[in-house]
């Protein structure tokens, strides 16, 4: 519903049938809905049976019937989408502990025929390692097992699971420590296998703090791999990766049915049991890169709130739920319906399911979810609004069985609060609901993780990615539509259906599910973990897999923030200026991964401080077998030991090369998307390995690696600069001496002094090959682009026309300039864009200066639309050290209306208003709509001095020099200002309003208070009347155009516009013109009847 949408949006696809210009009713989304396949079957109401299991419903909703399977004769293949574990009882004939409870892994998935599968995997036990004390021998294992077992069981508080066995096995093994090179001789470690995942932490804690065996002390023995999640441990050891295909060979699995023991626990069509060492996990390449037709349910709810109060689940009813279900790989949703409270007029292309009672509607919807059996649940802000609201509302109304929305019959879906914090996403309050076997895939969450946008409302996102606007209904208006008739409820249903359809459009456009699925396959973690966890789990999973094959184990590291820092990447000091000649750009291909591979940088190759001499004596390690990095760290060369990280990176980049080659020959559009998602996931994964080593609060930080990588990067940038400038000289026969004008992390910009794009590109390619030949393989410098012209403003701030071929430019590329910054008003971005367009594309500096002057004049005279002045900032926390404008405004809005006030994690829109001199900016922030409605004057000086001046001077100083400020920010165009009189605040409440003459604006003399003109202007009454009527007519035409535009967006030219989309500039224009029109009508009415 709209209320949750500070996150809200549209859905407007490409209609399949041509639009009739005379057909006002059926446009855009409505036409698209009607044009879907089987639309004629959809326009009907269905009756549904009762109960959470096996109800009689539409066949269209059900999955295809499963085949008759015989485990002794058939293999079972399915793509798993979710991996989780639970505590169950041992199954006779399965490995592992034989007295319960035991951990069982559940894999949920889909077959190629579209049947849902629940696979119980038995016998896998959690374990960890500790260093073996020197006196510990093989014969001590059994004694340690019994002693530790007793300690762990005694440590259990309230043994409600009746655990009788905690430590299953103790073994003496030989492994290599991943951290640091100590030769190839394996060390002795004790492997401790326990019955339940929670006993890993308990056992390692007891070993550290208590006396387990009197004759041997374990307290100083370091623990290894005791911080690995059980699901990840299982996937690593069984070679399962996220979203890959699992095959159960005939004769090695059991099927559950109504006669089996144990009985089925899930709602899946096929439920099976298998031992952890009896199934085949296929690598997701070749034939096994295919994708099953898993079901995605996108839904949206509408609530009937009270005026001025955001809906509350205990009070405000759910009135509509719209649903769209699509199979992955198909373009159209095959299920389209809307559940409504009270009668609703039919909608072509959608089932309308009407209900008399809210409890009945919620009951039927939960039954619908169980029947459709979706694999993925999506929508917009469903985690923080739709799911919690539905569950809380159903609980309040005591709707029986509603909360059983997952695939396990006896597990309720419950709401859990969580605080998410990461460098990538900031700090956000989040709610999480469990749906065993179904993956919640909130589109808003995906966008917050992956895209930096000015606004995250569904409408803003829709416009950004799909170039479509949509009607946005405020939550206070929804109740009026619900309380109307079946036609107003139909309008609401269309709006609700759009908001369910749009996430599917955006998921397809952004390839979000395919990309995340491929990332899960590449990194080896479950799909849901990619959404709910940070970056480190992805690298950790890959590192564990590679370490397992080589006999390495990973020490447990307690996360502690460290003050120790390493020097970052080099930035060559920029030679600022406006370059009218072509500037060649040379980029290092995958710079940091290449450095790690070329110089064998890894945990396993690091020579720790103080061990060099020991290694020289014990391992005969020669000086020429060790490489000293520019950061003064030492690593053994690959001839001594090839590092794990370089091997991981090599396999990732080789797999990416294969995927890109396959992409070149693949013709199937969906397979192309999968391959493109795969190569992107492989690229991101390779680049994140370096970040894993540098994360100080992480699983395995190693500043020696990350510091060495950036140190090598710095020397390579400097070396590239020296090579280019020493080789490309007039003395060597070239046109001019080349100059490196800027270098940043992994690229250098070179001015070869040539005039043509062709020659600049030719020299760029030649220089890339020349410099690459000087570096260790696989470090490679590539020529990618030419900027022509190029505006170099400062470090990490530049703009230019981006050419990859000489005939035409690809785009205007900007970095660090206010065109791409989100914490400025759109006025800044639009002005910067227009200036850069005039400077770079039109090459008209004088025109750019004139345009800037005009915009500044418009700003000072109050001619800029308020939508261009809105600044947005994220409410990341409420306890900033200094007072912040958006935080103070959020507090002010909370006092006005707690329901609609911004919450933690939201982006807060505000404008800066005029106030007394020296008033701090945080006190001048105000809600844009409040400003419009109360004619609060804007602080134009703030926008000029704090928002526009610095960006403008940065762009124009390289062109105008020291005169830039006096030319742009001072002069004739800044002398005229318009001041708006506020209706609120200040002295407005104490002043008496007096009438003034409509002609000369002077106060009316005594005796003329009711007249429209003073005696001096009265002779010109006819002329002045015509002027006021003309002004009114202009405003009416403007309002009519804006109104019609909004009607077209809402797809009906006959209904009132009720949209309140604040991300749409027309919304503010419409509000302002409406107010101006009201004022102008009052001015005209002062003339009275035109009898004169």
Curated annotation (Swiss-Prot):
CDD domains: DNA_polB_delta_exo, POLBc_delta
Comment text on domains: The CysB motif binds 1 4Fe-4S cluster and is required for the formation of polymerase complexes.
MF terms (GO), sorted A to Z: 3'-5'-DNA exonuclease activity; 4 iron, 4 sulfur cluster binding; DNA binding; DNA-directed DNA polymerase activity; nucleotide binding; zinc ion binding
Cofactor: [4Fe-4S] cluster; Mg(2+)
NCBIfam families the record matches: pol2
Motif placement: CysB motif: 1046-1064
Family statement drawn from the similarity comment of this UniProt entry: Belongs to the DNA polymerase type-B family.
Cofactor binding: number and manner: Binds 1 [4Fe-4S] cluster.
Reaction catalyzed: DNA(n) + a 2'-deoxyribonucleoside 5'-triphosphate = DNA(n+1) + diphosphate
Motif (Nuclear localization signal): 4-19
Annotated keywords: 4Fe-4S, DNA replication, DNA-binding, DNA-directed DNA polymerase, Exonuclease, Hydrolase, Iron, Iron-sulfur, Metal-binding, Nuclease, Nucleotidyltransferase, Nucleus, Transferase, Zinc, Zinc-finger
Enzyme Commission number(s): 2.7.7.7, 3.1.11.-
PROSITE patterns, sorted: DNA_POLYMERASE_B
Region Disordered, residue ranges: 1-71
Gene Ontology terms: biological process: base-excision repair, gap-filling; DNA replication proofreading; DNA-templated DNA replication; nucleotide-excision repair, DNA gap filling
Gene responsible for this protein: PolD1
A Pfam family reported for this protein in Swiss-Prot or TrEMBL: DNA_pol_B
Activity's dependence on pH: Optimum pH is 7.2.
Chain positions recorded as Zn(2+) binding sites: 997, 1000, 1014, 1017
Activity regulation summary: Inhibited by KCL. Also inhibited by carbonyldiphosphonate, aphidicolin and N-ethylmaleimide (NEM).
Compartment(s) where it occurs, according to its Swiss-Prot or TrEMBL record: Nucleus; Nucleus, Nucleoplasm
Protein name: DNA polymerase delta catalytic subunit
Annotated residues for binding of [4Fe-4S] cluster: 1046, 1049, 1059, 1064
Its job: As the catalytic component of the DNA polymerase delta complex, plays a crucial role in high fidelity genome replication, including lagging strand synthesis, DNA recombination and repair. Exhibits both DNA polymerase and 3'- to 5'-exonuclease activities. Required at the nucleus of rapidly dividing embryonic cells to activate genome replication during the earliest cell cycles. Likely to require the presence of accessory proteins PolD2 and PolD3 for full activity.
Note: In eukaryotes there are five DNA polymerases: alpha, beta, gamma, delta, and epsilon which are responsible for different reactions of DNA synthesis.
GO annotations of cellular component type: delta DNA polymerase complex; nucleoplasm; nucleus
ZnF (CysA-type) residues: 997-1017
